[in-house]
């Protein structure tokens, strides 16, 4: 009985990892698998990863995989402009914030708490990623902090809407699965 529960948990973890990795490849960079340009889901996937996987080893693995995707994309398409430099480290911090917030809301059943933490995490992660890119990447050598913030705000609505759309889709899907599982369990009793 305990062995079966343990194996079921392990199976769920690996299934979660495979799905997250697939979605990251599907939505990141120049979209290596499709010609359809899907919005980047990385922020949402790191929040979901924090909820489902929790352990730092999974965060490190997922971040390393995101770097590999970017490097492969750069090698296949030189017009794809993502600098792998000091500004790129902002993604490590941003993704870490999403992971941390995800781990904090992993067991919540409150949609209000889920949305509030997701919004807060997304805003903080966006602010850090855009500011580190603008100020540290070398792409804008003369940019001031004020100009960097103004430039970042131009991209906030689009990034926020995409990230929250993915996160809310996850909430809806997992809620349906949870309800289905609970109703099957109740029927069996």
Residues covered by each model-derived region:
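Membrane-embedded alpha-helical hairpins and interfacial helices in multi-pass inner-membrane proteins
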Residues: 109-189
